[in-house]
Amino acid sequence: MASPPDTDGFSDVRKVGYLRKPKSMHKRFFVLRAASEAGGPARLEYYENEKKWRHKSSAPKRSIPLESCFNINKRADSKNKHLVALYTRDEHFAIAADSEAEQDSWYQALLQLHNRAKAHHDGAGGGCGGSCSGSSGVGEAGEDLSYDTGPGPAFKEVWQVILKPKGLGQTKNLIGIYRLCLTSKTISFVKLNSEAAAVVLQLMNIRRCGHSENFFFIEVGRSAVTGPGEFWMQVDDSVVAQNMHETILEAMRAMSDEFRPRSKSQSSSSCSNPISVPLRRHHLNNPPPSQVGLTRRSRTESITATSPASMVGGKPGSFRVRASSDGEGTMSRPASVDGSPVSPSTNRTHAHRHRGSSRLHPPLNHSRSIPMPSSRCSPSATSPVSLSSSSTSGHGSTSDCLFPRRSSASVSGSPSDGGFISSDEYGSSPCDFRSSFRSVTPDSLGHTPPARGEEELSNYICMGGKGASTLAAPNGHYILSRGGNGHRYIPGANLGTSPALPGDEAAGAADLDNRFRKRTHSAGTSPTISHQKTPSQSSVASIEEYTEMMPAAYPPGGGSGGRLPGYRHSAFVPTHSYPEEGLEMHHLERRGGHHRPDTSNLHTDDGYMPMSPGVAPVPSNRKGNGDYMPMSPKSVSAPQQIINPIRRHPQRVDPNGYMMMSPSGSCSPDIGGGSSSSSSISAAPSGSSYGKPWTNGVGGHHTHALPHAKPPVESGGGKLLPCTGDYMNMSPVGDSNTSSPSECYYGPEDPQHKPVLSYYSLPRSFKHTQRPGEPEEGARHQHLRLSSSSGRLRYTATAEDSSSSTSSDSLGGGYCGARPESSLTHPHHHVLQPHLPRKVDTAAQTNSRLARPTRLSLGDPKASTLPRVREQQQQQQSSLHPPEPKSPGEYVNIEFGSGQPGYLAGPATSRSSPSVRCPPQLHPAPREETGSEEYMNMDLGPGRRATWQESGGVELGRIGPAPPGSATVCRPTRSVPNSRGDYMTMQIGCPRQSYVDTSPVAPVSYADMRTGIAAEKASLPRPTGAAPPPSSTASSSASVTPQGATAEQATHSSLLGGPQGPGGMSAFTRVNLSPNHNQSAKVIRADTQGCRRRHSSETFSAPTRAGNTVPFGAGAAVGGSGGGGGGGSEDVKRHSSASFENVWLRPGDLGGVSKESAPVCGAAGGLEKSLNYIDLDLAKEHSQDCPSQQQSLPPPPPHQPLGSNEGNSPRRSSEDLSNYASISFQKQPEDRQ
C-alpha cells in the first residue's frame, strides 16, 4: 500500500493502496480521502493505477462519498475471504483485500471517516454502526462511533438481498433488491434506489430463520408489522447465506439475554417452531441460533436439552440446535415449543431440571411415554408443547421430547396457541387435544408429577408398529402398540390379571407397556401403572415405525354407551370419557372367548383408503382395515382389525378392493342407545360373540346364536332414534360400531358368502327403517338394515343384498333387493329360513363374490334440517303404527338390478326363489349376477309386490317394460283419484327382474319417460278402456292400454314397463333402456309449481296425504330430461346424482282414493303453498303382515303415507309401500274443494 504523499494535493489522503474489485478481480488503486474544505467530503476513490492518481492525469474512475454510505461491513464470499463492503441507498460497493490485516486496516480507516462524516451529515444514511459480527473489536469500535453520532441505530450488518415473490414478499409486495440491515434489536428491509420506508422487524418477532444454498429465509410471527409469514431472500452465494444465518442467530441469542422473560404468547406465536428468536439465542452454541432467539426463562433447561440437540443439528454454529431453527422437521411446529415460553413456567422447568438434567432420561414412567430414540427428539421438545417439535430435525434432546410428549404431546403449540396442533411422527395426536390441555398452564403442560406420568402417557395414542397388537388398557384408553421392539410388560396395573382378559389374551397385555393409551382425561387413570413400568423404556420402539392408532377394546355392553366395561377397575375408568375414547374395541374385551383374533395375523394396511363413491369393500386380504381409524361421527368406529380381526372375512372384501365409505353403515351407535332391546344380546355386555347390541337398541344384532332374533322395532317405540351425528360416517361399514361384526352379517354356515355391506357414499345420510308392514319375523331375515340416522343396525332378510339394504330400506323395506319373500305376508315362510342372517348380495346371490352395490339408498332423510310436517304426527301414532320410513326423495335409488327377485305371480309364486327370470322381450339374455352395467340401472321396483284391491288372493301380475319404441305416454289426469305412478325405475342395462305375466294387467302409461304414470286402469271402477284425461300440465298425449291387455301387449305399448297388478297399481314402472346405454338415467322431480328443478340437496317435506294427488304435471319435466318417451329414452344423458330429481308416480295409486285421504290431501294442499321445501315423509304405516296368506287390509289410518293403497285395497306389505311419496303440487279437483 502506498503511503499518502505529503504534497498539498494529497493532504487529505488517509490511505492508499491496491485492492481488487470482487467480481472482475482486477486490481485498482484505491485512495481514501478525509473531508477537507478544498477537496470536499470524505470519500473513497479508485484509479486505474497509482501512476494516474499521482500525476492527476485523470479524474478517479469512481468516487464514493462516505456520508452517503449507511453502513460499512466486512464480508466474505466464496471467491474473496477479505472483503470490505460499503452500502449506500443506491448500490453496494465492495473491495477485496489480499489479507485479513489489510482488510482490517481499510475497514478501520473507513469506519473512522464514515462516523465523522455522519456526525456532520446526520441525514446521510441512518448510521453505520458497522461492526462486523466477525470482528468484535471493530464491532465495538464501530458501535461506539456510530452511537456517538446518534443519527440512528447503527446497522451491525447489512446484506444486499433480492427478496423473492414468495410468502410475505409476495403478499406484502416486498420484491426486488433490498438491503437487509441488522441492528442489535431489529432487522430492516431497505429498498434499493427508493425512498420507501424501510420495513423494520423486531428480532423477537422472528420465529426462525434458515438458509439453503444461496437462499436465506426468515419466518416472522403475528407480532411482526407484516403479520406472520416468511421472507425468502436470494444472495450472492451460500457463504453469504450462511453468514447471514449465523449472524442473525447470534444477534437473536444476544437479545435473548435482555428479553429472557419473553412472553409465552410470543413463543407460542412462533408456532412454526423454528426459531423463536429468544429461544435460539440462548442456545446459540448448542441449540440452533434460532432457538437461541427465544429467551425462555426455561431457556436454561431448554438449553440443557437443546445443546445436545444442537450438536445433533450438525453445525455447532448452526441454529439448528433450536429445534425450530432447524425447522427441518419442525418447521410447522411453533418455535415456542422448543424451549419457548410455551414450555411451562420456569418452575416447571425447575421441576424438569430437578428431575434431572437427566431430562434426557426422564423418569421411567415418562420415558415410557417417550419411546423415541433420544437422538430423534428435538430440543424443542422441552416444552410439552414442543412435543411436536421434537419430531423436528431431531436436534432436541430426547428427554425434552419425551417429557413434553407425554404431557401435552398433542399440542404442538404453546397452550396459549391453543389452536395449534401438530402431529409429530411420534404420534402426538391431535385427537388428543382435550386431554393434552389438562391445564393450559405451562407447568401442567410441562410436567405433571411422575405419578401422573402413566396417565399422561396414555394421553397419547401410541402410534405403534403395525405388527404390534393393541391391548385394552385397564383404564380402557386406547392403547397403541409401538412396533414390537423393546416393549416391556408392565406386571401390575391389573393388566395381565384383568378379568376381562382370557388367559392367552392376558399374556398379550405385556404389549400394553409399549402402547400409549389415549387418556380420556388427564386425571382419569390412576398413577399406579406409571410406576409399574420397567426401567427406561424410552427406547421402546423405534421411532421409524408407524404405529397403528386403534381403540383398546370393544365398547362394553350396549347399555354402557361406549363407556368402559364395568369389569374394568374403576381406577382406570375415565370419569368423563368421550365416547370415542371410552370405546374399547380390542378383541381382548371379548371375554366370551369367541374367535379371539390372532393378533399376529392382523392384516397390514395397504396404505390407501379407497374413497370411491360406489362400493368400497375392504380388500379381501385384510381382516380389519389395517391401521386406519374410521372417521365416524362419534369416532367410535374402530379399525376392523380391532373390532373383529378374525371375523373379517376376505370374502367381505369387494373384488375391487375398495373399502366401503358408507354414509349409513358405519354410523356409530347412539351413546344412550346401548341398551339392547333384544334381551339375548344385552345379556352379554362385553361382547361375547359380539353380544353387544350393535343395533343400539333398535335392531338387536344377533349373532348366529340368535338366528331368529328379530329387530325389536318396538324397543325404540317403533321409532328409530335419529342419528346423533350429522357427519357422514366415512368408515368401512364393517368397521363402525354400529355395523354388526361380520358374524352379524353372515351366518357361520356360509362364510364364503360374506359380502361387505356396500353403500354408496351419498352426500346424504341414510336411514333404513323397519318397514312397518313387514312381519318382524320376516324382517329379521330380509336384510340387515343399517339406519345411519339412528346409528342402529337392523337385521332383515339376509336374502337382501348387503349394499341393497340401504336402498331397499329407503325404498320401503328392501323389496328391491333379492329378497323375494321379504314382502310376503307369510311369516311361516321366513321361519323356513331361520339361518339366513347372512346377507346375500343381490347381484351375487348365486355368486359367492360380492358385486358392486346395487343401489343408492334413498332412505335416510337424516341430513334434512327442515322440520317434517308429519314428524309430530308420526310420533303421536308411533304407538299404534311403526314410524313411517322417511325418505329424502332426493336421490334415485339406483339399482344395478342384478339378481332382482322375480315378480311374484301369486301369493306363493317364487316366494322363496330369488332367481331372476326375465322374459325374452324384457331381458334378451340373462345378465350375469355381478351386473355388468357400469352405471346402475335405476331399477327400483322389481321386488315390489302389489296387493290388489279386488281380492287378496289375486295373483300379482306384472307388466314388463314396454319396448323403447312405444312413445305413447298415458297422462292420467290429476282428477283420476287412484292412479298414481310408482317409483320410476330407470333400468339402463337389461332388466334383471323376471316378470310373471300371470294375469292381464293394464299397461303402465308413461308420461314422457316419467316413471310410469301408469294410467293402467287408472281406477278400478272406471271402464278398463277409458283413458284418464291428460292432466293440464301433461305435454304428451295420454293413451291407455286396456286393462285387459296382456302383459306382453303392455310391454309393447308402453315405454316404461312397470309391474302392475290387477288393480292397475305398478310397483315400479321401469324405464328399460337398451343395454348399450349404460348411462345413469336422470330422474327429474317435476315441480309443477314453477317447474323449478330442485337441487338434489334440497329436501322436500310434503304433507302426508293419501296418494290422491299425483304430480302428473311433473311428468312432463321428467320426460323432458329423462329422454321423452319411447325412443327418447335412448337419449338419457348421464347426470351426476346431484341432478337426479325424483318424480315418483304411482300409477296404482291413481285408482280409487280412500276417503280418509281426502282431508289429509286438503291439508297437504295448504302446506304445499306454505312450504318451500317439501320433505317427503314416506314412512308407511303397515300392520304386521298377517300370518295368513290372505292379504286382507285393515282400513288404513288417515295419515297413511302417499303411495300406499287406501280404501278397500288390501294393505300392501312393506315392499308395496313405496318409500317415496308421489309429490303432487297440484291438488286434485276434489281436494281443492
From Swiss-Prot:
CDD domains: PH_IRS, PTB_IRS. A motif (YXXM motif 1) lies at residues 460-463. Residues 12-115 form the PH domain. It is found in: Cytoplasm; Nucleus. GO terms for cellular component: ciliary basal body; cytoplasm; cytosol; nucleus; plasma membrane. There is a cross-link at residue 1180 (Glycyl lysine isopeptide (Lys-Gly) (interchain with G-Cter in ubiquitin)). Residues 1043-1052, 1069-1081, 1203-1227 have a biased composition (Polar residues). A motif (YXXM motif 7) lies at residues 935-938. Its main location: cytoplasm. Residues 1116-1129 have a biased composition (Gly residues). A motif (YXXM motif 3) lies at residues 608-611. A motif (YXXM motif 2) lies at residues 546-549. The modification Phosphothreonine is found at residues 441, 448. Residues 349-358 have a biased composition (Basic residues). A motif (YXXM motif 5) lies at residues 658-661. Signaling adapter protein that participates in the signal transduction from two prominent receptor tyrosine kinases, insulin receptor/INSR and insulin-like growth factor I receptor/IGF1R. Plays therefore an important role in development, growth, glucose homeostasis as well as lipid metabolism. Upon phosphorylation by the insulin receptor, functions as a signaling scaffold that propagates insulin action through binding to SH2 domain-containing proteins including the p85 regulatory subunit of PI3K, NCK1, NCK2, GRB2 or SHP2. Interacts (via phosphorylated YXXM motifs) with PIK3R1. Interacts with ROCK1. Interacts with GRB2. Interacts with SOCS7. Interacts (via IRS-type PTB domain) with IGF1R and INSR (via the tyrosine-phosphorylated NPXY motif). Interacts with UBTF and PIK3CA. Interacts (via PH domain) with PHIP. Interacts with FER. Interacts with ALK. Interacts with EIF2AK2/PKR. Interacts with GKAP1. Interacts with DGKZ in the absence of insulin; insulin stimulation decreases this interaction. Found in a ternary complex with DGKZ and PIP5K1A in the absence of insulin stimulation. This is Insulin receptor substrate 1. It comes from Mus musculus (Mouse).
